[in-house]
Amino acid sequence: MALRFPRFSQGLAQDPTTRRIWFGIATAHDFESHDDITEERLYQNIFASHFGQLAIIFLWTSGNLFHVAWQGNFEAWVQDPLHVRPIAHAIWDPHFGQPAVEAFTRGGALGPVNIAYSGVYQWWYTIGLRTNEDLYTGALFLLFLSAISLIAGWLHLQPKWKPSVSWFKNAESRLNHHLSGLFGVSSLAWTGHLVHVAIPGSRGEYVRWNNFLDVLPHPEGLGPLFTGQWNLYAQNPDSNSHLFGTSQGSGTAILTLLGGFHPQTQSLWLTDIAHHHLAIAFIFLVAGHMYRTNFGIGHSIKDLLEAHTPPGGRLGRGHKGLYDTINNSIHFQLGLALASLGVITSLVAQHMYSLPAYAFIAQDFTTQAALYTHHQYIAGFIMTGAFAHGAIFFIRDYNPEQNEDNVLARMLDHKEAIISHLSWASLFLGFHTLGLYVHNDVMLAFGTPEKQILIEPIFAQWIQSAHGKTSYGFDVLLSSTNSPAFNAGQSIWLPGWLNAINENSNSLFLTIGPGDFLVHHAIALGLHTTTLILVKGALDARGSKLMPDKKDFGYSFPCDGPGRGGTCDISAWDAFYLAVFWMLNTIGWVTFYWHWKHITLWQGNVSQFNESSTYLMGWLRDYLWVNSSQLINGYNPFGMNSLSVWAWMFLFGHLVWATGFMFLISWRGYWQELIETLAWAHERTPLANLIRWRDKPVALSIVQARLVGLAHFSVGYIFTYAAFLIASTSGKFG
């Protein structure tokens, strides 16, 4: 008999029903569960797949560069970044009628095009690219890297080139190489690019390979570096009248601590950015030489962890046993990596708008909104994934003997206290926040807005004041003209910071009031509830009072049969599944808040947010309804406009989202009956009955249906909001 899918599981391959296909897809990447898997093959497969991942990333970024060079208007945009709409790529669609062709022919293009809201134009411009030829060169280089990555992936699957398990478990060497090589050397290389190419480019000098060695980035060359006069590199920075991309008003400094923003581009000073990357490079190059490998010097991570027993005895045996636990569990390592990456991605979202690094991106409002929303959603999925793999670690890899009375074991020992405290925090936040919103809503409905409960966020305002915001009148730290920090700041460090924080044209430390106070606590409710569900799922993954033997059933199980009540819906997978809904809900509130506050800021009517955000109808009417009006009227009997595609996507997103409920609010027996009926009809219908299938059609399992429902819910939710966000922002600001 020919080998059937899935080849990695002979048991599943012999399943006579359609479960074979769905379950095969579901477990394709769960290498640990495959037939004949060994620890060595597991590590080697994952390692080789990393190269495939890199190849895809390089191919994708190469495609971005290639399509902009081929179909975009980069060179025209460079001449006038504030008024030319950047084109992502052309749209080829024979179904378009003439009104559509006209509506989508924008940005000086000859035919219908998509506008770029990803910020790539601003990024490429800032780092020194100026012509289509530059873009093509970059695309080819990335294509080359993609091919190299594919070859490397293939190579590391060949017997001679397969690394051993001991190589994968050499944590010190890996840390040294990743810290100094990946972060240190790459940051140093990036500093080099900024200093040699980007900064001269911002001053009107075009540096490429042909003149790279002739153009000195600084008039003094390397002299100050070797003579210790490093301060010379910071002298004579670009002036406030500097026109980006020209020599007008430019200076000669390459590494500065100016603070604040370039007045024309509203982005961080390039010389500050170069300085930052140099500092990062230095720190990581040092950090990459900390751990003991071949030479018998440096730290041994195992020794550090074994020695660390916190005083007072409250944490038991501290970190004993953790080194081997982490080093032998891929899920633990992945959980740590995802948790870190998730936080970093969310920080990227926050900092890309508040401290924009790319020239003119702050004035491209739709791009700002798109990038913030994009990074927050990505962060949400990555963070929930961290807890999922944490739970899998507890089920598959955790060894109680190895971790006796250490910090990990003690987390499990007092999980009731952790879970109940989180539950209390969630309940407190939820009832109080909703209570305030509902009270205010009723007061507005009864025509007595003055009876609202409006709480000033005085602690947050005090923190903003401590950083230099003067409008609240707190007179503390950097907002106090008498403080030594304030006086030092004028000359020594970041003199531009205080100007920037008190200028109302950027997003640094926005003025906050009662509306912000309320939505902040709504978001806190979402974060705490999401965390509660995820933490409970992980801490109860091995077992609970209700089901002490839970770990024997694996990560995702529907129930322990009909005869054991209370065992349904309590697998660690179910907790992850429920948490994703809360995660999406929370990020919905986060992005609504960010977007509405910024729309009013950009339009110059901040009072609309301040007045309407304190009650529920304000959010529904003055944010959601007002901003979706153009989408609801995307095309009508009079033709269409450039927002029509978003109007269609808005509808389509709702459709996908609603489809999710068909899988979520439904039971398996209903589908099985329906399938039996359809199969019966199929077999008795002429022509149709010529087509036979080998697998008996069966309904999706409970867990699979939930996954399909969750996927539709998530995708529809994000599509709907993406269309709303882009259309409502670009409709107002072009």
Curated annotation (Swiss-Prot):
The PsaA/B heterodimer binds the P700 chlorophyll special pair and subsequent electron acceptors. PSI consists of a core antenna complex that captures photons, and an electron transfer chain that converts photonic excitation into a charge separation. The eukaryotic PSI reaction center is composed of at least 11 subunits. GO terms for cellular component: chloroplast thylakoid membrane; photosystem I. This is Photosystem I P700 chlorophyll a apoprotein A2. InterPro entries: PSI_PsaA/B, PSI_PsaA/B_CS, PSI_PsaA/B_sf, PSI_PsaB. The keyword Oxidoreductase applies. It is a multi-pass membrane protein. It is found in: Plastid, Chloroplast thylakoid membrane. Its EC number is 1.97.1.12. Phylloquinone binds at W671. Belongs to the PsaA/PsaB family. Its main location: plastid. Signal peptide: none annotated. Chlorophyll a B1 binds at H654. The keyword Transmembrane applies. P700 is a chlorophyll a/chlorophyll a' dimer, A0 is one or more chlorophyll a, A1 is one or both phylloquinones and FX is a shared 4Fe-4S iron-sulfur center. It catalyses: reduced [plastocyanin] + hnu + oxidized [2Fe-2S]-[ferredoxin] = oxidized [plastocyanin] + reduced [2Fe-2S]-[ferredoxin]. The gene is psaB.
